[in-house]
Amino acid sequence: MIKVIICGALGRMGTMIANMVIENPELEFVGGVDIRDGTVLGKPVVPSEKLAAFIDEVKPDVMIDFTVAAATMINAKIAAKKGVALVIGTTGFTPEQDAELLDAIKNVPVVKTTNFSVGVNIFWELVRDAASRLGDYDIEVIEAHHRYKKDAPSGTAKTILKVIQEEVGKREEMYGREGMTERKNEIGVHVIRGGDVVGDHTVQFHQNYETIELTHRAYDRAVFARGAIRAAAWVPKAKPGVYTMKEVLGL
């Protein structure tokens, strides 16, 4: 069986992932890491400063990390040095952090993505196809999340923008509009924060007399956890390198 440890194991997402791990016959949950000691499903959770020793003790094959950028920067480097495969769902990295992290983890197999939902990964491919055919349309990206989400725009929205610009070329990202504005070579980006919205993402393609709109809505965080479980079962068999869910799903 594939031994799994979880960073942020005492949090809502970490606990959900742990419960899904024990339901998967390929995986074994052996413990976790958080800001304090504890237990999850009868397995030990240690503070992050003890991660290296904990890895030596329980010998995990995979570490799943859905925490915050600062914590992931530390934990992923430690795990990679120990030869542990990684599944990283943390978002909010600065470009400098992202480059540093990718360099530090390149010698182990890693699945790193801004969204583990199977539906979102299909959605990205639909957006790519539409953008490749509708390059002369005006494009707007709208995303909504719960009031507590820290990063804006979301990592998923940033991936949407990356996908679009790979197809239509570089455009200015226009975050909201105010006053007298003139349409230029841009993509409008609109961020909504409120209530308990799990995650809504919409891409609109506008042309005279018609609009095409693609939308993905997540109704439960379980969709992200399920994707992470698929990645955890896949990644130990992969060669060293950084992958996305596109490889996991065979898209």
UniProtKB/Swiss-Prot annotation:
Key words of the record: Amino-acid biosynthesis, Cytoplasm, Diaminopimelate biosynthesis, Lysine biosynthesis, NAD, NADP, Oxidoreductase
Known function: Catalyzes the conversion of 4-hydroxy-tetrahydrodipicolinate (HTPA) to tetrahydrodipicolinate.
Molecular-function GO terms, alphabetical: 4-hydroxy-tetrahydrodipicolinate reductase; NAD binding; NADP binding; oxidoreductase activity, acting on CH or CH2 groups, NAD or NADP as acceptor
Residues annotated as binding NADP(+): 36
Principal EC category: oxidoreductase
Similarity comment text for this entry: Belongs to the DapB family.
Name used for this protein in its record: 4-hydroxy-tetrahydrodipicolinate reductase
GO biological process terms on file: diaminopimelate biosynthetic process; lysine biosynthetic process via diaminopimelate
Active site: 145, 149
Enzyme Commission number(s) of this protein: 1.17.1.8
Catalytic activity annotation: (S)-2,3,4,5-tetrahydrodipicolinate + NAD(+) + H2O = (2S,4S)-4-hydroxy-2,3,4,5-tetrahydrodipicolinate + NADH + H(+); (S)-2,3,4,5-tetrahydrodipicolinate + NADP(+) + H2O = (2S,4S)-4-hydroxy-2,3,4,5-tetrahydrodipicolinate + NADPH + H(+)
GO cellular component, one term: cytoplasm
Positions annotated to bind NAD(+): 8-13, 89-91, 113-116
Entries under HAMAP family matching the protein: DapB (MF_00102)
Family annotation (SUPFAM superfamilies): Glyceraldehyde-3-phosphate dehydrogenase-like, C-terminal domain, NAD(P)-binding Rossmann-fold domains
Subcellular location: Cytoplasm
Keyword NAD: yes
Segments traversing the membrane: none
Binding residues annotated for (S)-2,3,4,5-tetrahydrodipicolinate, in chain numbering: 146, 155-156
Taxonomic placement: Archaea, Methanobacteriati, Methanobacteriota, Stenosarchaea group, Methanomicrobia
